[in-house]
Amino acid sequence: MDNLKTSVHEIYLSLSGEGISTGIPTIFVRMAGCSLRCGMTVGRKLWCDTPYALSPKAGEEMSVNQVLDKIQELSAVNIQILLTGGEPLEGRNREFSITLGNEIFRIRNSSGFYPRPRVETNGAESIEGMDQFVFTLDYKLPGSGMEDRMNLKNLEIYKERKNPLDEIKFVIRDKNDFERCLEIIEKHALVGNLLASPVQGELSPEILAEWIKYSLGSGLRLSIQTHKYIWGDQRGV
């Protein structure tokens, strides 16, 4: 596993900031490289909160063993591991993430504590056949300009997995996005952990909360990026 490498932007210990694992101590493994440019529609700005990790060259070449060593250095006990980016399932990151996930699962499976790493993925890359992971699966809405890149088969795989730790995240820019989110949930009969998160600086949490309050039966829950309330735009915390 020393020969298999990818570009890793950063590895650090913090608290999970959003979704069902909010507040849980977590080791973040951020890989470099993502081909999506969310929010960059006509006359509007990129909203990605990690633009510094979009380039595949925005990191240090690391092997699977080096990443495992860094994880062990950060925490001697088993805590949640989150593979994020960039996009951990795109390009060469994909094979790297699968190999890393398999090794973490092999090491941790007997302990019973967080044996499966969580993968934050943008919805464009397939999640098929990856039982060694739990997923935070994005679905990009019209306001992102990236909805045509979504792999719709992932929604069916999400349902088939029936993993209570999996979640689908919808990032909401405006009312049109919210209505489209409700359409997707109904059309694909989605249940489970369905998260709605506002685009920071473009939609207030208060407004999104009101919309969710009156979308009874959708199964949506509000998800706020709590790490931004604690640390602002600081990186690696």
UniProtKB/Swiss-Prot annotation:
The note on cofactor binding and number reads: Binds 1 [4Fe-4S] cluster. The cluster is coordinated with 3 cysteines and an exchangeable S-adenosyl-L-methionine.
Q: Name one GO molecular function term.
A: 4 iron, 4 sulfur cluster binding
The record's section on InterPro entries has: 7-CO-7-deazaguanine_synth-like (IPR024924), Aldolase_TIM (IPR013785), rSAM (IPR007197)
Task: Please tell me where S-adenosyl-L-methionine binds in this chain.
Answer: G86
Q: Which PROSITE patterns match?
A: RADICAL_SAM
The EC number(s) given in the record are 4.3.99.3
Chain residues that bind substrate: L15, S16, G17, R30, T84
Subunit details = Homodimer.
Name used for this protein in its record? 7-carboxy-7-deazaguanine synthase
